[in-house]
C-alpha cells in the first residue's frame, strides 16, 4: 500500500499532485508521496477541479458525484475520495 493511494472500506483515497494546462489528460505516476495527474483545464474559477472530477469519474467508471475533493480545493495538492469504484486504472492498481 502506497502513501499516495489507499483503500478505505469500499472507497479509494488518492493523494494527488495536479498539473493544470497540460497537453492532454493523463495519470502520470508517482510524484514523491503523491500520484501526479496532468489535466488540460486551466486553474481558473474551479475549471481544473471540475475537469479533474470528470476525468477521475471516467477513469474509475463512476458518476461524477461519487468523486469528492476532501482536501486541497484551491491548490495543486489534493486528497480525493473515490466512492465504490467500478474499475481501477492500471496506473493506480500498480501502486495500490
Swiss-Prot record:
One of its GO terms (cellular component) is cytoplasm. SMART domains: DUF167. PANTHER family: UPF0235 PROTEIN C15ORF40. Belongs to the UPF0235 family. This is UPF0235 protein VP2619. It comes from Vibrio parahaemolyticus serotype O3:K6 (strain RIMD 2210633).
